[in-house]
Design a protein with these regions (language model features):
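Extracytoplasmic/lumenal acceptor-recognition loop(s) of multi-pass membrane glycoenzymes
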Residues: 180, 364, 372-376, 400-471, ...
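Active-site-proximal, structured, solvent-exposed surfaces of multi-pass membrane proteins
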Residues: 531-532, 712-815
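An acidic, glycine-rich "communication" segment
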Residues: 601-662
Length: 826
């Protein structure tokens, strides 16, 4: 007992030392996402003080966001609790969080060590676990606090999986289920990674031990039910249209050469933001595979397979698998290390000299990463650091003049810290951007703002800031290649839209527009774009309205006939003939319709991209287009940019009047022209995308001719005052004008007392008082899933308990028979 108390005391001391060193480090809270989690915890803490146990909506980020819906809520509650323990100080709460995670993670290993009769080794692993280089990376570089919380119970999960599979201990099944539920509610994506790692372990188990597969089936069922038990939250999280990235490109970033994962000096030469498996850990894994007893070998093999899967040579293989977008293999490193350490813990035949050497290597491997904890030790406080950031980026001044919402275009270079500074609980203002964009209903809107900044579509950028309700804007300028010309273009575009430059420094320009305190926007567009890639034309021609729905059957003739031009690219339909009839009717009555042939859907009946009597056929160009013979003259467009030299596009058959053609292999290929009448225009060769990439003036003139639009024209916008009040479960909006864009993002938890309409992911209301009530999304469906999962879980536990009891009786019977036989022999 005294030994246990001593170990617990040592763990507590280590945790306090960690808290102290971090508090004096001068760089805390570090980590790209840390401030995002601190912000959420602080918002929840304030809500809890006001009696709101589950904030449905936070208006401060992304024009309003459901912060508890798309990111697992357990870490948010945990951080709110830590903030309460710190007396309401969110940064003190962060230190408490680190201390608790360090302490509880260590305690998990100690409990496991005691259970296996190896309390000293378990205590050492517990003291080491938080300081493993990859775990420190997650906490202090990535700022992934939810994953850090998962690390607390991961060893217990591995222990119970091993116990159920190898020891056939029934009580381990409920425990591993509960561990998995906890991890799912901490970080659903990471729980999925743990489940995939478990599949590897199960495969190794099946090959090594050749036992009944029923135990594996039970564990996998427990994992599946663990996911489903969280259905009351998980169903709504998956149902609400959460935006995802180009997953294959993101996935590629989480593979690296094997030697990079094993280079212990890389952290000293390239910084600490590198994934490191650990040379010592790899030596342990290889040593275990070669010399460990069969009972403790499975974890070593699992760790080795995971390590191999982190290498770049495996990317081309894994990317072909279904669900590969979730295989961010470098994120699996801590899981692999946990399996390896657990196998070492239960390897009770290993000679002490070897064990001591391995432990020394593991400890030495952590030393370079410890700087992540103690930093510069200059004692700079978070408040001082944030104040310096706010002054250097002009955020402080921008907040002081913001009436409604502030837009900071930083391309995430400042991480979540800038988002916290803008909307901090003390003196924050509402922001167009935020942190954790995957939870934003306006994810597409802000993505286009970033893209327009990168592509120098400044007129579009400032105009859409107005649409999003931003009266103040901060734009970085230090990365401009041609400072004089670029800054002049930026200022001119801002002035055209109505912004005035208030201040500037070497890094940022600050713009502001005089507006009513709280305002909405009434807008008239000349044109409308429909389809997944229609926004490209909007960036080049800001007077083209973006839309949310790509389905032509969602629109009416009356709705589209109000526009001078309708642009279609990447559109869909449910009823092809109805869509074609509507488009043809529009053109016959004076509306110009321009269709990008590359974005025409494939006809399911013919397997060909066809629409309104035309069909499109694939063609590839290398490096650049051939000579383009058009009604505007012969064009010689710019070459394709680097990375786009293999240009996959289409040409068009069936045009009545060909306005543009190119010759390829002695064949004339139409890429531009009309069908049926001069208002129905088709464009091929993916010229819109080419223009977005190159800004080729020749192509721009062609597109302007086709669209009959001026690239410098803006939509007609009128700012109108609104009275907006946010409550715990409702938003009250008072407007004196009809069809007002409130600049509040649209969510499926909204129900209005009078009709509300979504346009481009933003809420539009009518004249009068609109009360939008909010309710927990998909409560009945989610609760039903959790209830069914709970019943099935109990059934699984009961069935496995009966199986265990039967096996126990059989074992007791065998033992009793042996004892009787021995007595008879005597």
């Amino acid at each position: 007992m005294l030994g246990c108390l001593l170990v617990i005391g040592i763990y507590a001391a280590i945790s306090f030392v960690v808290m102290y060193l971090v508090s004096r480090s001068g760089v805390y809270p570090s980590g790209s996402d840390t401030m995002c989690h601190i912000y959420k915890g602080s918002v929840l803490y304030q809500a809890l003080k006001n009696g709101n146990w589950y904030p449905l909506f936070d208006p401060m980020w992304y024009n309003g966001v459901e912060m508890m819906r798309y990111w697992a809520p357990m870490p948010v509650y945990f951080l709110a609790m830590c903030q309460a323990l710190a007396g309401g100080d969110c940064f003190g709460g962060y230190l408490v969080f680190l201390g608790i995670v360090s302490f509880l993670g260590a305690l998990s290993w100690f409990v496991i060590g005691r259970r296996h009769g190896r309390p000293v080794l378990g205590a050492i692993f517990g003291a080491l676990w938080f300081f493993m280089p990859n775990n420190l990376l997650a906490v202090f570089v990535e700022g992934n606090l939810p994953r850090a919380l998962c690390m607390v119970v991961l060893p217990l999960f591995v222990e119970n999986v091993h116990d159920y599979l190898l020891e056939q201990r029934w009580s381990s099944l409920p425990k591993l289920t509960l561990c998995f539920v906890f991890m799912t509610m901490c970080h659903t994506g990471y729980a999925g990674m743990i489940a995939l790692a478990l599949l590897i372990f199960a495969a190794v188990y099946a090959i090594l031990y050749r036992k009944s597969l029923w135990s594996i089936v039970h564990v996998l069922l427990a994992i599946i039910l663990g996911f489903l038990l969280t259905g009351i939250w998980l169903y709504a999280s998956l149902k609400g249209g959460i935006t995802s990235t180009d997953s294959s490109q993101v996935m590629r970033q989480f593979f690296q050469e094997a030697w990079l994962s094993l280079d212990p000096l890389r952290r000293l030469t390239q910084g600490f933001d590198v994934f490191y498996f650990g040379l010592a850990a790899f030596i342990l894994v290889i040593f275990g595979i070669l010399f460990a007893k069969k009972r403790s070998m499975a974890g070593f093999w699992t760790a080795f397979i995971i390590f191999i899967c982190t290498t770049t040579m495996m990317y081309d293989v894994l990317v072909l698998l279904p669900g590969s977008q979730y295989l961010w293999m470098l994120r699996f490193i801590s899981i692999a290390l946990c399996f390896a350490l657990y196998s070492l813990l239960i390897w009770n035949t290993l000679k002490k000299p070897f064990l001591v050497v391995i432990l020394l290597l593991l400890v030495l491997d952590t030393v370079p990463s410890l700087q992540l904890i103690y930093g510069t030790m200059d004692g700079t406080t978070p408040a001082q650091r944030l104040e310096q950031l706010e002054e250097g980026t002009l955020i402080a001044e921008a907040k002081s003049i913001t009436s409604q919402r502030l837009a900071l275009i930083d391309l995430s270079t400042l991480g979540a810290t800038a988002a916290y500074c803008i909307s901090d609980p003390e003196d924050g203002v509402m922001a167009t951007f935020g942190a954790g964009w995957q939870s934003a209903a306006t994810a597409m809107n802000i993505s286009r703002l970033n893209e327009s900044y990168e592509n120098m579509n400044y007129l579009y950028m400032f105009d859409r800031m107005v649409e999003l309700g931003s009266d103040t804007a901060l734009v970085p300028v230090s990365n401009f290649t041609n400072q004089t010309d670029d800054l002049l273009q930026l200022d001119e575009a801002a002035k055209r839209v109505g912004y005035e430059r208030i201040d500037s420094n070497e890094g940022y320009y600050l713009y502001h527009m005089d507006t009513p305190g709280s305002f909405g926007v009434c807008t008239t567009y000349d044109a409308i774009g429909i389809g997944t890639s229609a926004s490209l034309i909007s960036m080049a021609f800001p007077s083209v309205e973006e839309t949310s729905s790509t389905n032509l059957n969602d629109y009416t003739y009356e709705e589209l006939s109000r526009y001078h031009t309708v642009y279609l690219s990447g559109f869909t339909y449910d009823q092809k003939k109805e869509a074609e009839d509507m488009i043809l009717k529009l053109t016959e009555n004076g509306t110009r319709v321009v269709i990008l042939a590359d974005g025409i859907p494939v006809d399911t009946a013919t397997g060909i991209q066809s629409f309104l009597g035309t069909d499109s056929h694939n063609i590839n160009f290398k490096n650049g287009y051939p000579e383009l013979d058009t009604i505007d003259g012969v064009l010689h467009p710019d070459l394709f940019p680097s990375g786009y030299t293999d240009w996959k596009t289409v040409y068009i058959n069936g045009l009545d009047d060909v306005w543009g053609a190119a010759t390829d292999l002695d064949q004339s290929l139409g890429f531009y022209g009309t069908k049926y009448n001069e208002n129905l225009i088709f464009i091929g060769f993916n010229l819109t995308y080419h223009y977005a990439l190159t800004k080729d003036q020749q192509v721009g003139v062609l597109l302007a001719h086709a669209l009959d639009l001026d690239a410098n024209a803006l939509p007609e916008r009128t700012l109108v005052p609104l009275d907006v009040t946010y409550g715990a479960d409702r938003i009250t909006i008072v407007s004196d004008t009809d069809d007002v864009n409130t600049t509040i993002s649209d969510h499926d938890i909204f129900t209005g007392n009078q009709p509300i309409e979504e346009k481009n992911h933003l809420i539009h209301v009518s004249k009068g008082t609109t009360v939008i009530t909010m309710s927990y999304p998909y409560l009945k469906e989610g609760a039903l899933i959790s209830l069914i999962a709970a019943i099935l879980t109990v059934c699984l536990w009961a069935a496995t308990w009966k199986r265990a009891q039967k096996r126990k009786k059989e074992t007791e019977s065998i033992i009793k028979n042996r004892e009787n036989n021995n007595l008879n022999r005597r």
